[in-house]
Design a protein with these regions (language model features):
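Core catalytic region of metal-dependent phosphoesterases/phosphodiesterases
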Residues: 1-94, 153-157
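Glycine-rich phosphate-binding loop signature in dinucleotide/nucleotide-binding domains
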Residues: 11-16, 121-124, 196-198
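Conserved beta-sheet core of the metallophosphoesterase superfamily
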Residues: 134, 140-199
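Receiver (REC) domain switch-region micro-motif
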Residues: 20, 128, 160
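A structural signal for the main folded, soluble domain(s) of proteins
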Residues: 5-12, 111, 118-119, 168, ...
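Binuclear metal-dependent hydrolase catalytic cores centered on His/Asp/Glu-rich metal-binding motifs
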Residues: 97-152
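Active-site regions of enzymes building and remodeling cell-envelope glycoconjugates
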Residues: 85-86, 100-102, 125-126, 172-177
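Active-site glycine-centered loops adjacent to acidic/histidine catalytic or metal-binding residues
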Residues: 24-25, 61-62, 131, 163-164, ...
Length: 199
């Protein structure tokens, strides 16, 4: 609450920011959300976005998807339909924000894998916003993931910004942005925040 009330929304207002990109894992549990958590999410995040006319692009992350093989049934879609300012992505998509072409890549799973990799190959967009599991990056401070996709398939892009891992790290053109605030003890004394993408 303190992060949203005292940091995030005041910054957006002060700098006239009218678009937010959420890189996934907005919700934590695949199968359910408590009423208390949903009420808090609406009060702290979704309602202020709506009240301030902020268009919000939300990628489906692995924690948002109910099943492991498809993103189609997901908490983002089910819990944000009442907000016309929120656009949910469970399939890869190309969009344009402020004159900048972006490839939006939600969690890559069996259902969207072929389409995702074809779009990575064919797109003319130079920037990817994703929820990617790439090997060789730190999930948490000091814990390197040895599984996942090879990051070299993204070499053609100028910049890749991705969610999924809590630890902020950069290697070449790939930027794991980390989570905005501490969520577990693994995040203790690990830099947190949000990022501004100036189009």
């Amino acid at each position: 609450k303190k992060f949203y009330d005292e940091v995030f929304f005041p910054y957006l207002k002060e700098h006239n920011i009218n678009t937010v990109i959420d890189l996934g894992d907005t919700f934590d549990r695949r199968k359910y959300i408590s009423f208390t958590s949903l009420k808090a999410a609406k009060a702290m995040f979704f309602e202020p976005l709506k009240e301030n006319n902020i268009t919000t692009h939300m990628l489906v992350g692995n924690h948002d998807a109910v099943y492991r093989n498809t993103n189609e049934l997901n908490s983002v879609y089910l819990l944000t339909q009442e907000y016309p300012n929120i656009i949910e992505y469970h399939q890869p998509s190309e969009i344009n924000i402020g004159g900048c072409d972006l490839l939006m890549l939600p969690w890559i799973c069996k259902d969207n894998e072929k389409q995702s990799y074809q779009m990575i190959k064919d797109t003319t967009a130079q920037i990817v916003m994703g929820h990617l599991e790439l090997k060789g990056f730190q999930m948490n401070k000091g814990y390197v993931i040895q599984e996942g996709a090879d990051h070299t398939i993204y070499d053609k892009f100028d910049m890749v910004c991705t969610g999924h891992y809590h630890h902020k790290s950069t290697e070449k053109n790939i930027n794991y942005l980390g989570c905005p605030y501490e969520m577990t003890w693994m995040d203790y004394e690990d830099p947190k925040g949000f990022h501004i993408f100036d189009t």
